[in-house]
Amino acid sequence: MHARIREDLKAFPPHLVTLVYLGDYIDRGPDSAGVIQRLCKPAIPGAECVLLKGNHELMLERFLASPEAAQSWRQLGGMETLLSYGVDVKAALAGDEAAPMAAELLKKIPAPHRALLASLKVSEMIGDYFFCHAGARPGVSLDRQDPADLLWIRHEFLSSDYAFEKIIVHGHTPVEQPEFHPNRINIDTGAYATGRLSCLVLSSDEQRLICVGD
């Protein structure tokens, strides 16, 4: 995807480039640690980079802080993340306590990875668009949104035609093809399961897609 973005920038050079990532960098895929390592390095020279938090990063955060209270994370893709950092998951498979695994994971996550994960934002507003992982609660102004909704919301947001102050750009709920609605744009094409990754290109007068894995 980054190679395609670089090609696009050469063909259509803008004055300013901001890359916004919508979260869920870890879990389910085979190399969560590799993804975080990639995000630690500038992908596009000269571009501003905004990294948003997804609910899977939140689950990792909770697992490290309170292992026993967040064991469900392991069933939602956390096992793959543990493996990618070289954690011995035999205890997890045996149903033993989660605390030793959390302690081992904390030791094995490199400091730059921890710093990146700690720096993730829950939203970003740029021009006519509001970026977040999952969506926003209808009827609530964007500057008063609950962070939990920005990371987790589904039905109440997806089923609503509420006109927010900005167009919401989000992921979280996989769709076969990116969806464009008057109040929101969903670009989550379920890369972990489909191999399709979608990038939305926005400018003052344009909305278009760069897709890989089609």
Predicted features along the sequence, with ranges:
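N-terminal active-site segment of His-dependent metallophosphoesterases
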Residues: 1-36
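Acidic, His/Gly-enriched loop-helix segments that form or flank divalent-metal centers
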Residues: 79-87, 91-186, 190-196, 202-213
